[in-house]
Amino acid sequence: MAFAETFKALSDPVRRQILELLKKGALSAGEIASHFDMTGATISYHLKILKQADLIFESREKNYIYYQLNTTVLEEFLLWISTLKGDTSNAERE
């Protein structure tokens, strides 16, 4: 996992808001954009950064692309954070 990309992706408040939206389920780019006062191109840029960090993935359904959280990467990130604070109970289980 490339933590540098993860931190970069999480550093922007718009991208964090997009992740919050996606925790409820898959959304199209248009559905995501409807929650923001910015251009579709700007939303696409933020989605690209989130995809590069593997925080989201896309699936195609007919003419639409839907975006979803990649919980695997989030779990790896949280596990790494927990080892930093000395909580090894999760790491010992694996």
Where are the regions that the model predicts?
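Short, low-complexity interaction segments enriched in Ser/Thr/Pro/Gly
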Residues: E5, Y45-K48, S59
